[in-house]
Amino acid sequence: KEKSIHDYVSNSVGIMHACGHDGHMAMLMGAAQKLSLDRNFDGRIVFIFQPNEEHGLGAQAMIEEGLFEKFSISEIYAFHNLPGSPLGEVSTRVGQICSSESLFEIELNGIGGHSSMPHVCKDVIAIGSELIMSLQTIISRKLSPGSGAVLSVTEFISDGQRNILAGSAVIKGDVRTKNSADRDLIENLIDKMCQGIATEHEIEVNHIFNTEFIETINAQVPTDIVI
């Protein structure tokens, strides 16, 4: 259960306020209240509370369900919190403002067995660890230091036990890029590394690379209005 001392602490076991989405909802509600009380503007404002901001693809679902047919919207202004910035400060610019997000998942199938007999096994923990270290060289050795790209391995799960060498494992991770060229290069290198490790260790390696969101690009006119 959440151990925060704030007034809005979660009362549900296993659920806490740990990401910015709760803040986004509160911020938009505050903006709606402010503008509703002070209607000193022309036109109409529609406040869009996007569900499932990230992997739920909430924006896409809202569009498919007829958001723009129900409301006449000519421009959209979105915002995202930025912890560490001074209170009241807004940061924006024309062009690319947020990175894309791609997810990768790699499945390794070797041969499990007793921990006392590694020579007759295909230990996917050792092989997967080798692959993870290779993945870390993509950003540091294949892309420009100024690219702003990030590759993070975030999960490494196997079917092994304390005295049993794993026969299968899954590696998952997240990739952020500022342009499609870097994203394509990273995807291609992950593919080559998976093929190489499979050949070297004579195991089966399958992988997927899915781009959830492309880069956020700010248009000139709306950005000028904000500034």
Ranges and model annotations:
Residues A126-I227:
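Metal-dependent amide/peptide-bond hydrolase catalytic core
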Residues M27, G58-A59, V120, I186, ...:
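Residues at alpha-helix caps and immediate loop-helix transition turns in enzyme cores, especially N-
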Residues A26, E54, K178:
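Residue-level signal for short amphipathic helical patches enriched in basic/charged
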Residues H17-A18, P118, S180-L185:
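Ordered, soluble secondary-structure elements with a strong preference for glycine-centered loop motifs
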Residues M25-A32:
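DPxDG-like acidic metal-binding loop motif
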Residues S4-M16, D22-G23, L35, F41-I164:
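Histidine/acidic-residue-rich, glycine-tolerant segments that coordinate divalent metal ions
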Residues K1:
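Acidic-leg catalytic submotif of subtilisin-like serine proteases
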